[in-house]
Swiss-Prot record:
Gene Ontology cellular component terms for the protein in this record: cytoplasm
Subcellular localization: Cytoplasm
Family recorded in the similarity comment: Belongs to the methyltransferase superfamily. RsmH family.
UniProt keyword annotation of Transferase present: yes
Protein name as it appears in the record: Ribosomal RNA small subunit methyltransferase H
Purpose: Specifically methylates the N4 position of cytidine in position 1402 (C1402) of 16S rRNA.
Gene: rsmH
Principal localisation: cytoplasm
Cytoplasm keyword on record: yes
Amino acid sequence: MVANSGGGLTDADGGPVRHIPVLLKEVLEALAPAPGKLILDGTFGAGGYTSAILAAGADMIALDRDPTAIAAGQSMVAAHAGRLTLIQSQFSQLADHAPQGGLDGVVLDIGVSSMQLDEAERGFSFSKNGPLDMRMSASGVSAADVVNHAKLADLIRIFVFLGEEKQAPRIAHAIEKRRAEAPFVTTRDLAGLIEIVTPRKAKDKIHPATRVFQALRIFVNDELGELAQALFAAERALKPGGRLVVVTFHSLEDRIVKKFFADRSGRAGGSRHMPMVHERLATFDPIGKPMISASDAEAEINPRARSAKLRAGLRTSVQAEAADLSIFDLPNLASLGKLGG
């Protein structure tokens, strides 16, 4: 990816890039792509990172659970014959698509892509009216299923744990009352109700529906569970000296990545579920600063970068440890009642 004569970006094929990859310079510095290296992009999206890594000479495996992203990326595959393999898959399964201990790098850009937000029919954005869907693939329950059929207590838990929404009870009660009259069908249906229940104040920096939409998206796609499993998978797939680079966009995701690197650094630690443990050999060493955020200049150009955080680790030669989800202290939503139950 390079700057074009108009000051914008072009991909490696010379075409315009709509999506602006967040923290691109910092990602490349941490990942260190080079000819002869094999790197996996677990979140292909619009191909921003993949294009830049290919331009640096590395070969790529790229994954995305969204079939639309896979279809859109076929031109990039054709332009880099033999150097890019594009696979429809959840990134939690990345170890199934790479030689065990054979990757030089893994990059994960967590969260919804700008391409998905731009398409109203995907139902991710409250600013664009479309079906209340939010699924990154066609399978599983949709956001409309959750909003129309989940029990009141379950809605509150989803909004509190996954959206950190302080007005969760008020919003959930309003949803329950409204759906008894007519089901929620579109993003505007839900966003409009939330605007009425919790009107935006002058000091508010975000839309009142932001946290509820975030919570529904995370729940529908099991994003926190996917991220946790992807980190364990990357640990197995990286060779000694391989690099894991993760970009997150809100505190729930960043907390998981931070806890993973802390646990895998060999430092003693524990949680409310696990006692303190003795120091052990590290499977990852830190790369640079513990956390990197976007500069003011980048945030001005690309508003999506304002909340971005980058964490990276260098794989050691120590054998990968068993996957243990308890280290993340994730909210237990597995006990939610069946929709409509």
